[in-house]
UniProtKB/Swiss-Prot annotation:
Belongs to the MurCDEF family. It catalyses: UDP-N-acetyl-alpha-D-muramoyl-L-alanine + D-glutamate + ATP = UDP-N-acetyl-alpha-D-muramoyl-L-alanyl-D-glutamate + ADP + phosphate + H(+). The gene is murD. It comes from the Bacteria. ATP binds at residues 121-127. It comes from Rhizobium meliloti (strain 1021) (Ensifer meliloti). One of its GO terms (molecular function) is ATP binding. This is UDP-N-acetylmuramoylalanine--D-glutamate ligase. Pathway: Cell wall biogenesis; peptidoglycan biosynthesis. The lineage of its organism: Bacteria, Pseudomonadati, Pseudomonadota, Alphaproteobacteria, Hyphomicrobiales.
């Protein structure tokens, strides 16, 4: 745990005790703060109280007594409308911050020179975060991995000289971290997502920009127009910018040519490494993730050899284009993390004959943007609330069935793929949807897919 000493002896309000919220409360108490915590969920309040955290309904609190208000990232700060606790904090003039901001202040106070890499973007954050941490660890660095990837940042070991931090940041966390100042900050890409919480695409982009604007070195993917403009703006403001691209050559930066990653500097380009044969980094999207990891690791002093060794030994992440089983020439791929169309595109681009399981709780725009990949899809198996709208989009372009459930979709897709005599094929869960209509989260959905695949006759599991 990182004891938060910045508010020692002062009173701090905290709202949101699920997920990282309880860990944040404990870190504040450990650092000597007088914490008053609350949540709209009585079970979360009871759990915090049982853990020794002082709880009280903040509606009745004297807000002028608080030095800060710590808000969990899952609680609305601005859209669709501010949570009632946010309104009370504003009325009292109390600063509103989150757990990443508390981490940033502790690092600055106790070990400002320890390298800190922060990663954001609409898609690819977790893979890039895990890849960077893997490279650092295999190169022998003391590495702490946390943030939005699943480990609350304040549960990590405390900052000290020589310790590296790799932190995935959601837009919600950045919005609550006004002094975010990583050694290297990464913005991978920007596509419409979470607009229910940010109102407009421009507001969403403005929040993401803060992470790289405060960085020592800003690593920015320039394959979308908003991110490209951000790179230009941040560079004009005086920050060192390393541009990355999976789509086109760059005069300066790191870019992909097929599976080859090129490094352009001082007017010349040279091969940095080739990802061919690294199954866990298959596809153009992973070329971008690897390019970002290379740029960030170079920025914090890791050698080219150590970076390449780390890339080659990367084990990959669950639920992200994860090959989980084989049966003959059919591979079963768990890409449950693809919760929107943009995130599903990389998997669809990486295989040639696909039996596609898709659907769930639909996101804005549906799957119309995936039309270029429809020729690769032998048949689609549609599940969840999105099934009728996805069927309408597929129309006559792709054969489909409305399977309804994941179990039925897996069984039917596997049977159809087994009869495919035209070469290697993939039965792929890449839903292009959120999971919440049928599953608690994408992890549970992915695990269910793996379970249904494992129950099939004659499959060889790869995990």
């Amino acid at each position: 745990m990182i004891p938060v000493t910045s508010f020692k002896g002062r009173k701090v309000a905290l709202f949101g005790l699920g997920g990282s919220g309880l860990a944040t409360a404990q870190a504040l108490v450990s650092g000597g703060a007088d914490v008053v915590a609350w949540d709209d969920n009585p079970d979360s309040v009871a759990k915090a109280a049982a853990a020794g955290i002082a709880t009280a309904d903040l509606r009745g609190a004297d807000w002028h007594a608080f030095a800060a208000f710590v808000l969990s990232p899952g609680v609305p700060l601005t859209h669709p409308k501010p949570h009632w606790s946010v309104d009370l904090a504003h009325q009292a003039g109390v600063e509103i911050i989150g757990d990443v901001e508390l981490f940033v202040r502790e690092r600055r106070k106790h070990a400002p020179d320890c390298p800190f890499i922060a990663i954001t973007g609409t898609n690819g954050k977790s893979t890039t975060t895990a890849l960077i941490a893997h490279i650092l660890r295999t190169s022998g660095r003391d590495t702490q991995l946390g943030g939005n990837i699943g480990t609350a940042v304040l549960t990590l070991d405390p900052p000290k000289a020589g310790r590296f931090y790799v932190v995935e940041c959601s837009s919600y966390q950045i919005d609550l971290a006004p002094t975010l100042d990583p050694t290297a900050g990464i913005l991978l890409n920007l596509t419409p997502d979470h607009l229910d919480r940010h109102g407009t695409m421009q507001h969403y982009a403005d929040i993401k920009e803060r992470l790289v604007a405060g960085s020592g070195t800003a690593v920015v993917g320039v394959d979308d127009s908003l991110s490209s403009l951000i790179a230009d703006r941040v560079e004009r403001a005086g920050t060192k910018v390393v541009r990355i691209s999976r789509r086109h050559p760059l005069a300066e930066g790191i870019y992909a040519e097929g599976s080859a990653l090129m490094r352009a500097q001082d007017g010349a380009s040279s091969l940095f490494t080739d990802l061919a044969g690294i199954q866990t980094l298959r596809g153009g999207h992973n070329a971008q993730n690897a390019a970002a990891a290379i740029a960030a690791c170079l920025a914090v002093g890791i050698s080219g050899k150590d970076i390449v060794d780390g890339l080659r030994s990367f084990p990959g992440l669950k639920h992200r284009m994860q090959p989980v089983a084989k049966k003959g020439e059919v591979v079963f791929v768990n890409d449950s993390k693809a919760t929107n169309a943009e995130a599903a595109a990389p998997a669809l681009s990486s295989y040639d004959r696909i039996y596609w399981i898709a659907g769930g709780l639909p996101k804005e725009g549906g799957i119309t943007s995936l039309a270029p990949f429809f020729p690769k899809i032998v048949k689609a198996y549609l599940i969840g609330e999105a099934a009728p709208s996805f069927a309408a989009t597929l129309g006559e372009a792709v054969p489909y069935e409305i399977s309804g459930t994941l179990e039925k979709a897996v069984a039917h897709a596997a049977a159809d793929a087994a009869r495919d005599s035209q070469g290697p094929a993939a039965v792929m869960l890449s839903p292009a949807c959120a999971s919440f209509d049928q599953y608690k989260n994408f992890e549970v959905r992915g695990d269910a897919f793996v379970g249904h695949v494992a129950a099939l006759e004659g499959v060889s599991m790869l995990i």
